Amino acid sequence: MTDQEILNALTGILRDVLLDDTIVLTEDTRRDEVAHWDSFNYINFIVAVEVKFGVKFRVADIESFENVGAIVKQLKTMGR
C-alpha cells in the first residue's frame, strides 16, 4: 500500500470510531487536534487499525506515536 492508501484507511477507521464523517487526517495530524479523540477512543482506533491491517503494535510503539504519520511509517515497516 502507498502512504496515501494507508492514510485513507486510517481516516476511514477514525471516522468510524468517532462517528464523524468530516474528519480528514494528514500525516501531521495529532490526537489533540481532533475533537473527541481521547485516550479511550485512541485505544479503540489502535485496535481497529490492528484488525484492519492484521498487525499487533507493541505497547512502546503505541505510546510513541506522535502523529498519524508515525502510524503510517510503522505500518509500512511492518510490511503493510
Language-model-derived ranges and their functions:
Residues 2-47, 51-80:
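Phosphopantetheine-dependent thiolation modules in NRPS/PKS and related acyl-activating systems
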